Amino acid sequence: MTGNGNFVSDPIIAALLSEVSAKLAEIVESGTSFRIDLRRLPLPVGGTAALRDFLGNGQVEASFRGVGSCIFSETAVAGVWWGQQYNTGGDLVGEFIEIAYVPELLKCETDEIEQAMKDLGLKVREAQQIRGRGSESSSSTNRSPPSSVSNKT
C-alpha cells in the first residue's frame, strides 16, 4: 500500500478500513462479495483521494459499458476493488469499494453463458456450411496438391 497513512486517525476512515479488513476475512470463508458506497459515508475532505492512495494500485483495470459505464480498478490489496460509476454524460455518479474475487458486474450470469454457447454453436455451424460450400466448388476444379504434400506413385 502506498500513500500517507495520517488520515487513518480519522474515526470514519479507521472504521472503513476495519470494515474492509473484516469483509476480506468473510470473503475467504463464504465467497460472498461486499460493496461499500463511499458517497454515502461522511468522509473528511480529501478522504476519498487519500483512501484510494492508501490502498494503492493493483495490476487489473476493467470497464463495463451499459447505461453509463463503470470502471473497476484492483487496489494493491488483493480482493479490494475501487469502482467508479459514470452516467451517459460522463459525470461521476458513484464511487465504491468492492470486496470480491471479481467485481459482481463483471461476472457472466449462467443464462448469458448458456445463450453464448448456443450462439457460438450456431456461428460455428454456419461457418462450416459456408466453408463446405466453398470446398465443393473448389474440389470440382483440378488443382495440384500443396507443395508440402508429396505424391507417391
Predicted regions and their residues:
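N-terminal domain-onset segments
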Residues: 1-50
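Helix-rich interaction surfaces within compact, conserved domain-sized segments
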Residues: 73-141, 151-152
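Short, structured protein-protein interaction patches enriched in aromatics and acidic/basic residues
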Residues: 37-41, 60-89
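Compositionally biased, intrinsically disordered/low-complexity regions enriched for serine, proline
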Residues: 8, 142-143
